[in-house]
UniProtKB/Swiss-Prot annotation:
The lineage of its organism: Bacteria, Pseudomonadati, Spirochaetota, Spirochaetia, Leptospirales. Coiled coil: none annotated. GO terms for cellular component: DNA-directed RNA polymerase complex. The gene is rpoB. DNA-dependent RNA polymerase catalyzes the transcription of DNA into RNA using the four ribonucleoside triphosphates as substrates. The keyword Transcription applies. The keyword Transmembrane helix does not apply. Gene3D superfamilies: 2.40.50.100, 2.40.50.150, 3.90.1100.10, DNA-directed RNA polymerase, subunit 2, domain 6, RNA polymerase alpha subunit dimerisation domain, RNA polymerase Rpb2, domain 2. It comes from Leptospira biflexa serovar Patoc (strain Patoc 1 / ATCC 23582 / Paris). The RNAP catalytic core consists of 2 alpha, 1 beta, 1 beta' and 1 omega subunit. When a sigma factor is associated with the core the holoenzyme is formed, which can initiate transcription. This is DNA-directed RNA polymerase subunit beta. One of its GO terms (biological process) is DNA-templated transcription. It comes from the Bacteria. Its EC number is 2.7.7.6.
Amino acid sequence: MHTRMQIRNRVNFGKITDLNLLPNLIYVQKKSFDWFLQSEVKDPTKRLNQGLEAVFRESFPIESPNNDMVMEYGHYVLGEPKRDPQECKDTDSSFAVPLKAVIRLIIKDTGEIREQVVYMGDLPVMTDHGTFIINGAERVVVSQLHRSPGIFFSYDQVRDTFSARVIPYRGSWLEFEMDNKGILVAKIDRKKKFPATLLVKAMGMGTNEEVLRLFYGSSKMKIAGANPKDLKRLIGRRTIADIINMETGEVMLDAGSKINEDNISILREMKVKEVDVIEFPKGKDNPVLINCLEKDGVNDYEDAVKKFHTIMRPGEPSTIENAEAELKRLFFSPKTFDLGIVGRYKINSKFEFNNPKEFSKADDRVLRKQDIIETVRYLVMLMSEAENYYPDDIDHLGNRRIRSVGELIANQLKLGFSRVERVIKERMTVQEPEQQTPQLLISIKPITAVINEFFGSSQLSQFMDQTNPLAELTHKRRLNALGPGGLSRDRAGFEVRDVHYSHYGRMCPIETPEGPNIGLILSMSSFARVNDYGFIETPYRLVKNGKVQKQVEYLTADKEEYHYMAQSNSTVDEKGEFTSKLISTRHRGDFPFRSPAEIQYMDLAPLQVVSVSTALIPFLEHDDANRALMGSNMQRQAVPLLTEEAPFVGTGMEARAAYDAGVCIVAKKDGVVSKVDATGVWIKEDQSKEIVHYPLIKFKKTNQGTCFNQKPNVSMLHTTTGGKVSKVSKERVEVTTPNGEKETHELLLSDEVQFHAVVKEGQEVGIGAPVAGQIIKGEKYGDFGQILQKGTVLANGPSTDAGYLALGRNVLVAFMPWEGYNFEDAILISERIIKDDVFSSIHIEEFEIQARETKLGQEQITRDIPNLSDKAFRDLDESGVIRVGAEVKPGDILVGMVTPKGETDLTPEYKLLHSIFGEKAKEVRDSSLRMPNGFEGTVIDIKRYSRETGDELAAGVEEMVKVYVARKRKLLVGDKMAGRHGNKGVVARVMAQEDMPYMEDGSPVDIVLNPLGVPSRMNLGQIFETQLGFAAKKLGINFETPVFDGASEGDVNDFCKKAGLPENSKFQLYDGRTGEKFINQVFCGYIYMLKLAHLVDDKIHARSTGPYSLVTQQPLGGKAQFGGQRLGEMEVWALEAYGASHTLQELLTIKSDDMLGRARIYEAIVKGIHSIKPGIPESFNVLVQELRGLALDIIIKDSEGLEVDISDYEDEFSKNKKKIKFETIENV
């Protein structure tokens, strides 16, 4: 049987979690790019107005300034990519398709139509795994979390005022707020303020009465014949309309005026029978709008519009046409103001605009007059504390939406197309109409520029984290609140970073970086998906009349507000009815108890709260949130190991995470394995009967320098002896050997692993011939990316074991202090771990050299390098490139190359040599590619590209060679390790296996951790994992304990009993050095440990002689620059305190930046002189020049008061040291 087929039984403790309902975990990326490109739509005329199509439609038609021609858009056409993704990586090119568009130019005078297919540039396209390849590097466009367009109402606690903001997708912001005088004012783009009623009147409500009737109710109160009590009630009320004396035409009371006793008397005298008064909400007098009406000073529509124009455009003539045009430009023109579909949806849902007769269509993307009026009305109601009117919570997920990759690219292209439009209009005016064609008018430079800028340098287009499959998957599911149009790190306060109740099931409350980005970079929860409007939805089971239905509904955060949600672990009987009379529910930010009849929805799974990374932590419920955060983040840093091993204690999420990460090869269709080797898997498909080849990726470098390698996960059954097939059934194949013995091959190994016979009864088979191939299932997906049938994993990728995510290894751990070697999270490990390559990993580095055409001639890749010994060439081939398999160390030549030197006039003798020997006699300089410091390993691959062989290379490059060097890294002292619970530490000592503490059966432990790392960190999950891990090892099974739905303490104890282990998992250990018992029993078991990408080899560094800074002449800093260690002010204090004056002087001068002193010390070492006189440090000269830059004339004098020229001073080699003081002009 094939060695990969190690089938371990799995025990899942989950009672609720159904992972089949999980959507495809990278569906967010794929769906968004499909929305943008619409490549599935075969007929271009049937494309929807979205994404790329919308960009074209918004930009065209383009009319010439003098109206003599117009350019129209037909449709766009996508070509085929030139190379496949792997080729693009190898050749440093982008995985892109040519974008062409059918453009028509119509000459209006003649009616002539000139149609052309115009090339619009190369558009990068997404790979099957949701990534882009730009210049050979795999990149991810991260989804952005930004404030949704719409209308928002907020409350300022300090000023005790309400305000409203209309935020469009594109265009001017409109704000309403209270000023200090109690007047409701409006602001456009945070400029000049004006009374809000002025804007309302400019909408067509001209008079004060019309405005008041618009926002308030009214009631009639009798005056004629009213009794004194009723008249008293009238005092203090406000009129809704002007009260006019009919005889004189005089306004007795303005609309909004308060009625007092004198007014009543006058009204009675005028024989007014009844008065229309304002009915304020809740009966409270709130004169906010009346104050505005007094302030705005206009009483009809025309005056209002003109005054508005004067405020917005002071100095310009205010005619009614100008004023109306300005108002239209600001809010009612699709060219300058766009709410977006989302903004319109938010406004319609806020003000319940769902009546199609009353309003125009719902996708009307400009502002409507009714929107402004309703905004003011809502604000007035908020100020009056009316019922069911609340300010918005800006941190609520109903008010924040996701801008995914498709939308981000579309926004960038809009920018490019607007620049193209300007160029087209300019060219239309310059050239004659007869000569013009679409191709000549369109310049694609702005489009390619914005595409390159976005993918190359945008904050949201990121170099993919490819350390392991989980890092890759999480990067694609990341949400970023930063970036253009988002928040900034410095201005983001605590509230926006904090966990909000609306994040439940949508964004993970655990996974976020530590440091300045905390709470701004988040991860989507495992079941979450993004709807068409960009809002995150999470699934719930519907509850009808207290019965839980099978139907699943996805809800956004704002829709969830109105419902009571039961938790997924609420007990339900077979009929779907709740067993308790009171159920714990969630409603907004509270957790009230409700009867089953009041519940509308129930959580789908406990897992839906957390992200994929957090869902991989077993016993998460026993860990403190801070440590769980570290555990989630550190799993992404785990280095893929040489031999992968799935955890004994997992969560059930491992298979799905590995499957969706895209590192495994998955069967597309049903079939049977017909051949397997190290390079690929061949499947005979059931339907087509064709044999399909799935090639494997072998030893490729990832973005982070880890090793990407795929190994077969399926197999065939082979005979060991050969003979005649005597029996073939569904269950087994029997082969009778020549000497009459029977060889039986079982075909049904488990539910997942089954074989199909590929031989017939009576057939003769040779030794090692295949008799059965594994049965393969093809993958099938639903509409929303959910898996209907999981495809068989044909090959494991990095960090995967039999299709399960395997980031680390299971090791035998003892929690005990050991002579201080595990003090403060340090880790003591056994030498067995290094001997057996338990935590060894392969790392691959790429080195590249380019031979260019220079002014002095062409650079040559050659073995013919001047002034080098034969030893340097020992591994180079005849063309000067190192052989595959060569062991290389720092300084070794990887590729030999020479560059021509500048030549002076040649002597006749030299010319003769040159003519005889050709190029060899020319002056050349060695510019070979050498192994840099700190790197060593084995050359595993060479890639050569040359113009001569037809390869496409960058301008000026004639030849390019890439050398790939692999290195096996064993676990070393100083390497960082961690568990899944935030329990991290550094390897402090490697102990001989025989000296490690050992158990009663003689088996030594692999790793010793400090027990003091557990109580204060409160990550008890590691204790449960260790205990259950030992039971798994003993019983030969793997456990799955889903988060918040996993094994209880009782379950763990039961399995320990079954495995014959003590319930407390404490054992008597013996000291490996003495053989004596330890005094107390020690807690032992199997824990899953990871080796993180913080390896000591990448960090440790020592400088011998290296580069110096040009200005200060001090050694550079950092490992990359081969720099030195900084001697800072604290170190200087320490030496001063110690009185080590000579040591200090030496460190500050000749060992740092005293150039003359450096030369002297070298000479002294050569000549054997021991007395060294330090000179002036270069930083002193820099200081003098800095002071001169401040216009201070610095004069340097010696102890005798004579002026010293620093340059002269440096020339004097043997003079005694001079005491120097420096003075400025002021104190001379």
